[in-house]
UniProtKB/Swiss-Prot annotation:
Annotated GO CC locations: plasma membrane; postsynaptic membrane
Keywords of the record: Cell membrane, Chloride, Disulfide bond, Glycoprotein, Ion channel, Ion transport, Membrane, Postsynaptic cell membrane, Signal, Synapse, Transmembrane, Transmembrane helix, Transport
A Pfam match: Neur_chan_memb
Family as reported in the entry's similarity comment: Belongs to the ligand-gated ion channel (TC 1.A.9) family. Glutamate-gated chloride channel (TC 1.A.9.4) subfamily.
Protein name: Glutamate-gated chloride channel alpha
Keyword Transmembrane helix: yes
Length: 461
């Protein structure tokens, strides 16, 4: 029995010795291969730790290995990607418009926040065929550098990229070499505004995008075929003083002395909200004009009341006009708001002039009436002398005089008619009576002409 056990141990030791010898032989072969190549790889270390297993080379499917392969194969990010036909690199663009804020009429600019997405093909970055066990795309970090279009915004005044919590940038490389670049940026853009119809105007603001250095021989920008411009949900109703009514995408290729440059343009149509100006400007100014007409019902002798009312309404209208103009830039043309304010001030000023005319006529009539009274007083003695020379028999024929009884209602009607006729014959009172009807009619006609001319830009009715 003991002899059998000893034999088994001897056989086992021989087998272990043979395996150890084989492992040493394989290790020497591995080191010799590594020394020939001049490198020591992770696969060699794995063979040393597991000498009894034959290593099998695994496909490079991890992102790190793919990136290491891409950026150690002579890739030069300073050179634009080559194309099959030698033409320009086609850059497909679409944008997500997130916010529009701070529409400044004085400086003619507005602020916008958007996500810009650009896509192009760089075959130097392709790393395999889809479906061979490799990922569909890899994401680059900030440290990696690849060729990118030199995109800029021609009508931009200020701009910055968002970096909280990390830079809001996405660079995705697909296995066929398609590159997707996405970035979130905020822009302050110039927007030339035409204020002829202010505050019922509709403005057209744009976002231009072009290449700064590459001409159309090198880069061609194209809008994405489907959904080139996307709007964030609720954007149209989030503007405080405007309403986003329409958007469109066009091309704006420019020709300069350095070449022809591809350009894309997004046009944003903004309609000003009229309700604010209706409550803050048009209704108060109408009330001021109507208040100025109250002086037509004052007695012509109420000079302090009529002057105070006219001057107060005129000064109030002037202050309102100054407040509106302080929110607008100085322009060389007449705006709709200028026509309205000018007409209202004209009506108020004419009401004040009407009182001056009435007062002048009344004073002139007073002087004439006083002179006529003095002449009548001077003629009374002469009439009395003539009366004494008339025969008394003329006044004794009382039987020929007939009396007509009048009731109170007929007497009042007669007196009112006499008083109205007297007022109409009084020129100063006649001017007040005409003004009471003429001013409202003229203001109503002006409103019809005004709203038919300027109201068509903004649906009011």
């Amino acid at each position: 029995m003991a002899t059998w056990i000893v034999g088994k141990l001897i056989i086992a030791s021989l087998i272990l010795g043979i395996q150890a010898q084989q492992a040493r032989t394989k290790s020497q072969d591995i080191f010799e291969d590594d020394n020939d190549n001049g490198t020591t790889t992770l696969e060699s270390l794995a063979r040393l730790t597991s000498p009894i297993h034959i290593p099998i080379e695994q496909p490079q499917t991890s992102d790190s290995k793919i990136l290491a392969h891409l950026f150690t194969s002579g890739y030069d990010f300073r050179v634009r990607p080559p194309t099959d036909n030698g033409g320009p690199v086609v850059v497909s663009v679409n944008m997500l418009l997130r916010t529009i804020s701070k529409i400044d009429v004085v400086n003619m600019e507005y602020s916008a926040q958007l996500t810009l997405r650009e896509s192009w093909i760089d075959k130097r970055l392709s790393y395999g065929v889809k479906g061979d066990g490799q990922p569909d795309f890899v994401i680059l970090t900030v440290g990696h550098q690849i060729w990118m279009p030199d995109t800029f915004f021609p009508n931009e005044k200020q701009a910055y990229k968002h970096t909280i919590d990390k830079p809001n940038v996405l660079i995705r490389i697909h296995n066929d070499g398609t590159v997707l670049y996405s970035v979130r940026i905020s822009l302050v853009l110039s927007c030339p505004m035409y204020l002829q119809y202010y505050p019922m105007d509709v403005q057209q603001c744009s976002i231009d995008l072009a290449s700064y250095a590459y001409t159309t021989k090198d880069i061609e920008y194209l809008w994405k075929e489907h959904s080139p411009l996307q709007l964030k949900v609720g954007l149209s109703s989030s503007l405080p003083s405007f309403q986003l009514t329409n958007t469109s995408t066009t091309y704006c290729t420019s020709v300069t002395n350095t070449g022809i440059y591809s350009c894309l343009r997004t046009t944003i149509q903004l309609k000003r909200e009229f309700s604010f100006y209706l409550l803050q400007l048009y209704i108060p100014s109408c009330m001021l004009v109507i208040v100025s007409w109250v002086s037509f019902w004052f007695d012509r002798t109420a000079i302090p009341a009529r002057v105070t009312l006219g001057v107060t309404t005129l000064l109030t209208m002037t202050a309102q006009s100054a407040g509106i103009n302080s929110q607008l830039p100085p322009v060389s043309y007449i705006k709709a708001i200028d026509v309205w304010i000018g007409a209202c001030m004209t009506f108020i000023f004419c009401a004040l002039l009407e009182f001056a005319l009435v007062n002048h006529i009344a004073n002139k009539q007073g002087v004439e009436r006083k002179a006529r009274t003095e002449r009548e007083k001077a003629e009374i003695p002469l009439l009395q002398n003539l009366h004494n020379d008339v025969p008394t028999k003329v006044f004794n024929q009382e039987e020929k005089v007939r009396t007509v009884p009048l009731n109170r209602r007929q007497m009042n009607s007669f007196l009112n008619l006499l008083e109205t006729k007297t007022e109409w014959n009084d020129i100063s009172k006649r001017v007040d009576l005409i003004s009471r009807a003429l001013f409202p009619v003229l203001f109503f006609v002006f409103n019809i002409l005004y709203w038919s001319r300027f109201g068509q830009q903004n649906v009011l009715f």
